[in-house]
Amino acid sequence: KLKEKISTKTRAILICNPSNPTGYLYSEKEIRALIEIAVEKDIFIIVDEVYREFIYTDESHYSVLKDESGSQHAIMIDSVSQRYSLGGARVGCMISKNKELMAMALKFAHLRLSPPTLALLASEAAIKAPPSYLKGVIQEYTQRKNVIIAALEKINGVAVSNPMGAFYCIVKLPVDSAEAFSKFLLTDFEDNGQTVMLAPAAGFYSSQELGKDQVRLAFVLESSKLKRAAEIIQKALEVYKNS
């Protein structure tokens, strides 16, 4: 099906591995298959691997740069934003073994403004963190994932995905419009002065017909706050259905 979508206007295949928002982890076999298509069609395959350490299964992350057969077609994107919780730093990189492509990228980079000095200094310090730091981070996110999934599964009518990686869940709600419910949470509902902000999932789909009853939830807060968020969502759903 992917091959059928590729036309003379297609320049690249772009994926995120693990995926935002689904948390899907592409296997080595799938990455190799995508590389094969990129080589056959003479296009690039661009893979955002910013979440590559955030894996919750026994499978390991397979980088697009590992396959030499696609070395002239593969581009890997990385950033300090997720790994070190530096979302505002806007410090990242693109890596490719295609020397001509990298030369063109460097020419373009000279025409753009550079990141703030403080962001660069913070990033330099962050990447020096020992392996034990990331190990602790992954353990914490694994616990958070398990906590929020368990809490949401207790809510009647709610279905939640179990992500293989990254730190997002796609949550199906018992509502016709997740966007309307998300707005309701922010404008018309509170529980003891608190509410929850959700991201409607419809915007992540290429088809307007999909994801209307889904939201993306990021488990980036400590477990106690995630439990509280699930409690608020449950109470809000009860009020929303009766309004």
Question: What are the functions of these language-model segments?
Answer:
Residues 1-243:
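PLP-dependent class I/II
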